[in-house]
């Protein structure tokens, strides 16, 4: 960045100087929202090596309170925990005064919406590969009991070698607490990708809502169009539950039966009837390319780590609950009840 470009609502000269001391140089702005901007950035690893990154700058002084108390802490927690080849990974997070600087992998070929706009509908074989990569990333997230809650074409990035990565975890959250599924009550995401249960305004299971949104992404890739084109929430909901959508005539005869079935299973108004991301990784449509049904070594090892992390957290919660129960018994224990508590302690220590 040069001249007046260095100073705007988000970044100041002081911010840029501090970042440069850490080896990070912000270049041109490539996206912006109400209280966040995204820049292309360079990380000078050493005198001979540098990496091109994206930097999301969040100005908390401009953000609403509910974002600061709920969404931002969740996003940071998720970003720190996740690591998967088809999810945009974070390289560094810095906080300076009221601002967060989040450095992520840069997507050389932009997002999926840009790709569709420039290149048209995606051939089925390419869709199969990209959808398999998206499902792999979401299966990993869901296995960690994390829901994305804002799946859309703009949040699928395309790398230099034309692989895809899921990005933007501003609405992501943990969806299990003490072994129980947490229903979401917040309207999240974009209208065109929102599941009917989200539009209805009732508590919903966010993992299942993610799967609906993935169905919309798949349809959009194949058709270069959305299945529902309504700006009215009421009319959109009615079309969703009545299944009023169809493939475009220009592509319908080019698609395999398995592909069309896959879309239909995902754009399913009954949330409980939608398939999971994990089950779709070996579904008939993906299996038309047999090698895609096999996880890579990295995918498999990271998934196992994610599952083990969830198990460890559950054990920690169980132990914490038991300690809390004993403490409560101690508080309540009087007279003859005290002996029972002491015996209980001994039985636990055996």
Pin down the residues of each PLM region.
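Glycine-rich ATP phosphate-binding loop
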Residues: 37-61
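Conserved short submotifs of the Hanks-type protein kinase catalytic core
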Residues: 97-111, 115
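Activation segment
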Residues: 171-173
């Amino acid at each position: 960045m040069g001249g007046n470009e260095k100073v705007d609502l988000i970044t100041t000269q002081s911010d840029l100087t501090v970042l440069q001391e850490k080896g990070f140089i912000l270049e041109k702005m490539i996206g912006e929202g109400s209280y966040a901007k995204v820049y292309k950035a360079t990380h000078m690893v050493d005198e001979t090596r540098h990496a091109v990154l994206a930097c999301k700058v969040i100005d908390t002084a401009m953000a609403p309170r509910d974002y600061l108390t709920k969404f931002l802490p969740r996003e940071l927690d998720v970003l720190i925990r996740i690591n998967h080849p088809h999810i945009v990974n974070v390289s560094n997070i810095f906080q300076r005064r009221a601002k967060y600087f989040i450095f992520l992998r840069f997507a050389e070929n932009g997002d999926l919406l840009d790709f569709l706009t420039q290149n048209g509908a995606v051939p089925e074989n390419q869709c199969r590969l990209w959808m398999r990569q998206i499902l792999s990333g979401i299966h990993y997230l869901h296995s960690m009991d994390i829901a994305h809650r804002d799946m859309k074409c703009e949040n699928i990035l395309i790398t230099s070698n034309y692989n895809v990565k899921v990005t933007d975890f501003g609405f992501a959250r943990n969806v299990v607490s003490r072994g129980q599924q947490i229903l979401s009550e917040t309207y999240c995401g974009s209208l065109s990708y929102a599941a009917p249960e989200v539009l209805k305004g009732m508590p919903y299971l966010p993992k299942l809502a993610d799967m609906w949104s993935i169905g919309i992404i798949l349809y959009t890739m194949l058709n270069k169009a959305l299945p529902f084109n309504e700006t009215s929430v009421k009319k959109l909901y009615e079309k969703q539950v009545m299944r009023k959508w169809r493939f475009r005539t220009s592509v319908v005869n080019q698609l395999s039966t398995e592909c069309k079935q896959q879309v239909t299973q995902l754009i399913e108004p009954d949330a409980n009837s939608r398939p999971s991301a994990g089950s779709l990784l070996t579904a008939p449509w993906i299996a038309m390319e047999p090698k895609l049904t096999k996880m890579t070594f990295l995918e498999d090892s990271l998934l196992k780590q994610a599952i083990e992390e969830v198990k460890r957290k559950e054990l920690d919660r169980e132990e914490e609950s038991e300690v809390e129960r004993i403490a409560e018994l101690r508080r309540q224990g009087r007279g003859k009840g005290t002996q029972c508590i002491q015996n209980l302690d001994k039985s636990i220590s055996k």
